[in-house]
């Protein structure tokens, strides 16, 4: 509740502006409306000039906190000038009564003395008693002028009694009053509020307040994304953002009665180094937030992809080999978020310890306090004790005495299900210099680490090791990818968080019981017992070489060959880890972009995986990896593709033997389907089953088969030759359009063009043909609306467009051109994806495989299929997928005579045309002969 202090280099001249106001008042004597209009115009000009100067200064010195202080100081000055203008020139009362007093107070974020350029202003008008005509008029002048300036103002008018009463009942109001700051008016009235608030509201309610604030924090994180490593973070409300720092300060103000952030160190809340970290984090986050507001010219707090590069450049980041400027900036951002998390953990643990909590449950509720439990020794070690159900050091120098304890403490906490005592956490972070080459090579330290990795609850323990800095010091290659962001729309987390989540996925696979992982859960029980640790190591390390100029799979295998002998792995096991890392993308690529019914696909994949044991391990790694990319990325469709690839390949590797051969799997899939339709007549079931080729029964999951059957039956009973069904996949944030039509070579192109003309972006396509010549295509399009009702109406419009095109009522080229002229999304424009086209005859004996990769855009699939047809090629099958901003589409084609494309000159012409299309949006080549 301290008064605002101007930044040292502040140049706002209040005296000059006050003189101009006096001149305006004299000029407009007797015309209050004209004076108020002129007053607002003057203030608007002054504020605009001050903001321009603040932005220029921020670009020069990059001090975010100083910029926020400067903007706040200017706003303070404007409000004081408005208050003075209202009370001196408009509603002057030479002898005010006791009720004609008012205090103008800043609250909320503004009350902290820090403002982002487009932030709202929260004001509290405090009165001694009830509202008076004079008070209402003065408040009205201030508010209307601020609104005329273009500011968003939240406001309330209350007496001191009302403030106290409402603060007791409402935690939001209590927090707002906690952060009030005097601006103008009667200081005695403000002093009364402060004194009564401390005595009548704060005293004896610390536990209640802390519990409420931490519960709010958890809910805020849930809304904005639980992980602090989400790649489009919310700088204000996200985990590790400014609001977390604010929560720390609120709690400290309430519990320790500090007034200024500098007192956090004086009161022992943080040690001097931790307070310097607090200030450094705060300054960086304010720099980012202020720059976002200046760039967008709105109160935007999400650091979205289309902003990240520009903000990074404004903050002075440059590209280095293997890392773009934007990736270096975001790595720094996530390192800061990690440090904010550490500060939060330290304060929360300190509070809980002081309150002698039985478990770290402040984030859930601060229940009744009880006396501290007696310290007792941790089993298996004399160096650590259990202190209030937290692991702590028996003596201060346990790490210096034996550096292996820096690893051992995490293993003991894991085995005994203990949280960390704040003193232990601090000691760990202060002892990182003890993690030397000698400790990294220590057999006991490495044995303990492998135990951590392969034991229950490895994910949270590894995350704690990462957040304290131990993991990155102990495995230096891991340290290089800590907080590393990949600048793309596919990965939802930083590299280190992705790897740790993948370990958690592996443990969930091993526990079993989740149908998402049915195949992998079955396989993990069948791998050799001595390969279990190999699998865990491969999962933890598979992306460890991200950010290097060399391909990360190849470079990661080299890291594994250096690292795994440290872990006690044999030469053979080390090579197996390296192989898994080197091949970790192969199974996903083949499953999603190759024709799994083509014998050559299976033979080629079998040649890569070599043995059933290696294929089992690669299947499990692939499953854990895909699920760790982000919410909804792993789904039933991909699970079915992986399952099909596995079981199609198994007989090739075993010389014809398979635990479940192909014919049996087809029969089992059909039996499973039949069991879902007991109400159908047997003849109808037999006829329907016969309509689908074997690949359909192997590649499509049961729920989709059921939907297809009901859709086909209803459409045909209604006499529809063309029908469209709409479904929603919330996990993937897509809408599915299933289209039933008479099959013909241009059908996919027509559907893609219809979607493009309707503004729908295709992210996936599953294409099947029935034995009676009907096409059954499921197209997944990006979801545009949150509510299913709105999305359903949009999908219906898209379906109508598809029908109009297929019925010849709408010409596609013109419709697509009209939609394309509206431009693509800004988020996609933030990315650069080099176009790539590969033409290969080795993946099929019958078809030429064309694989294209480039920046996704509305209408791309239509453009590609149209161009391929114009190149006199027939598309036999297509495998369509998007990975964030990158489209990767694979087409199995022949020439018009049904032969592969073997002539090098023709292959080169096809490649030139498609590369040009990917880069420029049109095909430059004429049809090839």
From Swiss-Prot:
Cofactor: Mg(2+)
First and last residue of the signal peptide: none
Stretches the record annotates as Uridylyl-removing: 380-735
UniProt xrefs under InterPro entries: ACT-like_dom_sf (IPR045865), ACT_dom (IPR002912), HD/PDEase_dom (IPR003607), HD_domain (IPR006674), NT_sf (IPR043519), PII_UdlTrfase/GS_AdlTrfase (IPR013546), Polymerase_NTP_transf_dom (IPR002934), UTase/UR (IPR010043)
Residue ranges of the region described as Uridylyltransferase: 1-379
Recorded superkingdom: Bacteria
Keywords from the UniProt entry: Hydrolase, Magnesium, Multifunctional enzyme, Nitrogen fixation, Nucleotidyltransferase, Repeat, Transferase
Cited SMART domains: HDc
Activity control note: Uridylyltransferase (UTase) activity is inhibited by glutamine, while glutamine activates uridylyl-removing (UR) activity.
Domain ACT: 736-818, 849-929
EC number of the protein: 2.7.7.59, 3.1.4.-
Role, per record: Modifies, by uridylylation and deuridylylation, the PII regulatory proteins (GlnB and homologs), in response to the nitrogen status of the cell that GlnD senses through the glutamine level. Under low glutamine levels, catalyzes the conversion of the PII proteins and UTP to PII-UMP and PPi, while under higher glutamine levels, GlnD hydrolyzes PII-UMP to PII and UMP (deuridylylation). Thus, controls uridylylation state and activity of the PII proteins, and plays an important role in the regulation of nitrogen fixation and metabolism.
Family: Belongs to the GlnD family.
Protein name according to UniProt: Bifunctional uridylyltransferase/uridylyl-removing enzyme
Organism: Rhodopseudomonas palustris (strain ATCC BAA-98 / CGA009)
Lineage: Bacteria, Pseudomonadati, Pseudomonadota, Alphaproteobacteria, Hyphomicrobiales
């Amino acid at each position: 509740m301290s008064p605002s202090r101007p930044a040292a280099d502040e140049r706002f001249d209040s005296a000059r502006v006050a003189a101009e106001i006096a001149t305006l008042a004299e000029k407009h004597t007797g015309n209050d409306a004209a004076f108020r209009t002129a007053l607002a115009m003057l203030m608007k000009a002054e504020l605009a000039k001050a903001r321009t100067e603040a932005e220029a200064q921020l670009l020069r010195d990059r001090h975010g906190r100083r910029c926020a202080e400067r903007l706040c100081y200017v706003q303070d000055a404007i409000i004081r000038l408005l208050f003075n203008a209202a009370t001196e020139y408009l509603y002057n009362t030479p002898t005010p009564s006791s009720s004609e007093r008012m205090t103008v107070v800043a609250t909320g974020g503004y009350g902290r003395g820090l403002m982002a350029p487009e932030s709202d202003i929260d004001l509290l008008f405090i009165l001694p008693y009830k509202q008076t005509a004079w008070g209402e008029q003065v408040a009205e002048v201030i508010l209307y002028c601020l609104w005329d300036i273009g500011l968003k103002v939240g406001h309330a008018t209350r007496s001191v009694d009302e403030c106290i009463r409402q603060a007791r009942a409402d935690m939001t109001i209590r927090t707002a009053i906690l952060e009030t700051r005097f601006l103008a008016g009667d200081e005695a009235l403000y002093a009364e509020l402060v004194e009564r608030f401390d005595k009548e509201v704060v005293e004896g309610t610390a536990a209640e307040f802390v519990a409420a604030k931490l519960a709010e924090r958890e809910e805020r994180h849930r809304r904005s994304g639980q992980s602090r490593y989400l790649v489009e973070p919310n700088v204000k409300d996200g985990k590790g953002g400014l609001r977390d720092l604010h929560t720390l300060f609120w709690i400290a103000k309430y519990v320790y009665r500090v007034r200024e952030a500098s007192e956090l160190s004086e009161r022992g809340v943080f040690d001097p180094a931790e307070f310097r970290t607090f200030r450094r984090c705060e300054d960086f986050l304010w720099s980012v937030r202020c720059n976002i507001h200046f760039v967008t010219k709105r109160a935007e707090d999400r650091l979205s992809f289309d902003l990240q590069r520009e903000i990074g450049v404004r903050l002075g980041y440059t590209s280095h080999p293997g890392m773009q400027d934007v990736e270096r900036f975001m790595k720094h951002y996530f390192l800061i978020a990690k440090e904010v998390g550490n500060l939060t953990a330290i304060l929360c643990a300190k509070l809980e310890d002081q309150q002698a909590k039985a478990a770290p449950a402040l984030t859930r509720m601060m229940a009744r306090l009880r006396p501290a439990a007696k310290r007792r020794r941790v089993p298996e070690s004399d160096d650590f004790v259990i202190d209030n159900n937290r692991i702590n050091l028996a003596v201060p120098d346990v790490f210096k005495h034996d550096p292996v304890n820096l690893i051992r403490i995490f293993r003991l906490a894991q085995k005994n299900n203990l949280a960390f005592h704040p003193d232990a956490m601090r000691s760990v972070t202060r002892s990182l210099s003890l993690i030397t080459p000698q400790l990294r090579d220590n057999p006991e330290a490495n044995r303990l680490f492998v135990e951590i990795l392969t034991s229950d609850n490895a994910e949270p323990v590894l995350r704690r090791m990462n957040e304290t800095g131990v993991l990155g010091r102990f495995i230096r290659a891991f340290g290089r990818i800590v907080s590393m962001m990949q600048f793309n729309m596919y990965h939802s987390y930083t590299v280190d968080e992705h790897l740790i989540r993948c370990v958690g996925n592996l443990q969930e696979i091993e526990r079993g019981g989740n149908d998402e992982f049915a195949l992998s859960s079955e396989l993990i029980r069948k791998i050799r017992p001595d390969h279990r640790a190999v699998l865990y190591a491969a999962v933890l390390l598979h992306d460890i070489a991200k950010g290097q100029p060399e391909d990360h799979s190849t470079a990661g295998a080299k890291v594994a060959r250096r690292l795994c002998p440290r872990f006690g792995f044999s030469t053979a096991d080390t090579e197996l880890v390296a192989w898994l890392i080197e091949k970790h993308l192969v199974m996903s690529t083949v499953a999603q972009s190759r024709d799994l019914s083509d014998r050559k696909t299976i033979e080629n994949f079998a040649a890569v995986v070599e043995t059933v044991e290696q294929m089992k391990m690669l299947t499990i790694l692939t499953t854990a990896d895909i699920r760790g990319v982000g919410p909804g990325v792993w789904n039933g469709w991909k699970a079915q593709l992986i399952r099909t690839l596995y079981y199609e390949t198994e007989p090739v590797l075993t010389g014809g033997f398979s635990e479940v051969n192909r014919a049996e799997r087809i029969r089992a899939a059909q039996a499973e389907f039949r069991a879902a339709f007991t109400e159908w007549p047997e003849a109808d079931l037999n006829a329907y089953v016969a309509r689908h080729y074997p690949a359909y029964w192997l590649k499509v999951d049961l729920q989709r088969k059921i939907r297809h059957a009901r859709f086909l039956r209803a459409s045909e009973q209604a006499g529809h030759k063309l029908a469209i069904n709409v479904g929603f996949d919330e996990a993937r944030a897509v809408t599915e359009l299933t289209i039933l039509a008479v099959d013909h070579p241009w059908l996919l192109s027509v559907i893609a063009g219809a979607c493009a003309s309707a503004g729908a972006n295709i992210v996936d396509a599953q294409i099947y043909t029935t034995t009676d010549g009907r096409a059954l295509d499921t197209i997944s399009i990006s979801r545009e609306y949150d509510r299913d009702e709105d999305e359903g109406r949009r999908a219906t419009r898209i379906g109508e467009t598809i029908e109009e095109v297929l019925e010849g009522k709408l010409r596609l080229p013109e419709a697509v051109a009209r939609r394309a002229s509206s431009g693509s999304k800004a988020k996609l424009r933030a990315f650069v994806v080099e176009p790539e086209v590969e033409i290969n005859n080795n993946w099929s004996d019958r078809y030429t495989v064309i694989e294209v990769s480039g920046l996704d855009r509305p209408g791309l699939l239509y453009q590609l299929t149209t161009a391929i047809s114009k190149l006199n090629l027939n598309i036999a099958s297509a495998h369509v997928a998007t990975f964030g901003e990158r489209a990767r589409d694979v087409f199995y084609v022949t020439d018009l005579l049904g032969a592969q494309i073997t002539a090098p000159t023709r292959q080169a012409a096809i490649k030139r045309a498609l590369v040009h299309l990917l880069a420029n949006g049109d095909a430059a080549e004429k049809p090839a002969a």
